[in-house]
């Protein structure tokens, strides 16, 4: 089922008038619904994860800073302020992604196919995850034409 119009959101620094036009256009697109919205986790200082990384232990991961928590709140406020309908929020199992989803949208479900395969430790999962993500999107049913958010 071809449900989604794909929308790529890129935040760049532009002049105020261009940003206002882009922002209005973006809001209009999201208000229409039926979009697949990819959101990267909010600010978590550094890159990658420590060598002792454990998916089930947030203390071994890079987590949101206070600035990141404020960013996540701002994301949620943006959707509420603009009355952008969300059907479902899916997050990877990484703590910074779950925390972003929780702060911004409150309700979310984790899906391992959204997990990072950035490091060599997880690269072996890439093909399986991409296939599962494509399958999920292909079979996703949304009768209310709301948006699907992936963090």
Where are these regions (language model features)?
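Hydrophobic alpha-helical segments, principally membrane-spanning helices and signal/leader peptides
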Residues: 1, 25-26, 137
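Sec-dependent N-terminal signal peptides
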Residues: 3-14
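Generic structural signal for beta-strand residues in well-ordered domains
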Residues: 13, 29, 82, 141-142
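Sec/Tat signal peptide C-region and signal peptidase I cleavage site
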Residues: 16-20
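Active-site-proximal alpha-helix that buttresses catalytic centers in soluble enzyme cores
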Residues: 22-121, 127-129
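A generic secondary-structure signal
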Residues: 78-81, 135-139
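Internal catalytic or translocation cores that form aromatic/hydrophobic pockets or channels
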Residues: 130-134
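Active-site-adjacent alpha-helix immediately C-terminal to a catalytic or transition-state-stabilizing loop
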Residues: 137-151
């Amino acid at each position: 089922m071809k449900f989604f119009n794909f929308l790529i959101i890129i935040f760049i620094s532009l002049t105020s008038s261009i940003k206002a036009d882009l922002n209005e256009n973006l809001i209009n697109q999201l208000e229409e619904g039926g979009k697949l919205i990819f959101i990267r986790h909010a600010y978590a200082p550094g890159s990658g994860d420590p060598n002792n990384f454990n998916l089930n232990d947030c203390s071994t991961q890079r987590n949101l800073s206070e600035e990141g928590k404020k960013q996540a709140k701002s994301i949620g406020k943006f959707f509420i302020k603009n009355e952008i309908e969300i059907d479902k929020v899916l997050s990877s199992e990484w703590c910074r992604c779950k925390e972003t989803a929780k702060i911004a949208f409150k309700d979310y479900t984790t899906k391992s196919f959204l997990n990072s395969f950035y490091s060599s430790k997880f690269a072996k999962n890439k093909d399986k995850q991409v296939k599962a993500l494509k399958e999920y999107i292909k079979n996703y049913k949304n009768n209310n034409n709301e948006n699907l958010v992936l963090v």
